[in-house]
């Protein structure tokens, strides 16, 4: 370090030590399944195990693979439904109505 340069603070960083024993950490790692192993296990389940299975809870559904989740299909609103909603909310969008009235007047000219 040069004599005229500002002094830099150096911190002594202790070596990271896990709060649990390495053996315990290894046991936890072995017990905890990875997403890939879950998919492999689910593909190779014998049928009799599937019959005894309890319905999934909400938490289990979030962890399920995309194939196992119920696929929802987007249904766009119909023209009839949009017109019905717009008819109900006409007072809710006054600026939108003004814009349509102005466009209609321009078409008439």
Curated annotation (Swiss-Prot):
GO CC term, one of those recorded: cytoplasm
InterPro entries per record: PPP1R1A/B/C (IPR008466)
Compositional bias of kind Polar residues: 55-75
Pfam family, one: DARPP-32
GO terms of molecular function: protein phosphatase inhibitor activity
Principal location listed in the UniProt entry: cytoplasm
UniProtKB keywords: Cell cycle, Cell division, Cytoplasm, Protein phosphatase inhibitor
Intracellular or extracellular location(s): Cytoplasm
Keyword Mitochondrion: no
GO biological process entries: cell division; intracellular signal transduction
Cell membrane found in the keyword field: no
Region (Disordered): 25-109
Domain of life from the UniProt record: Eukaryota
Record's compositionally biased regions (Basic and acidic residues): 45-54, 100-109
Function statement: May increase cell susceptibility to TNF-induced apoptosis.
Entry similarity comment: Belongs to the protein phosphatase inhibitor 1 family.
Protein name: Protein phosphatase 1 regulatory subunit 1C
Organism in which the protein naturally occurs: Pongo abelii
Classification of source organism: Eukaryota, Metazoa, Chordata, Craniata, Vertebrata
């Amino acid at each position: 370090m040069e004599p005229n340069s500002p002094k830099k603070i150096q911190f002594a960083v202790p070596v990271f030590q896990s709060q649990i024993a390495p053996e315990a950490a290894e046991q936890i790692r072995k017990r905890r399944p990875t997403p890939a192993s879950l998919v492999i296990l689910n593909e190779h389940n014998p049928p009799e195990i599937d019959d005894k299975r309890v319905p999934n809870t909400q938490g289990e559904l979030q962890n399920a693979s995309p194939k196992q989740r119920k696929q929802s299909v987007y249904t766009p609103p119909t023209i009839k439904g949009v017109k019905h909603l717009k008819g109900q909310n006409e007072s809710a969008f006054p600026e939108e109505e003004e814009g349509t009235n102005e466009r209609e007047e321009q078409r008439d000219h």
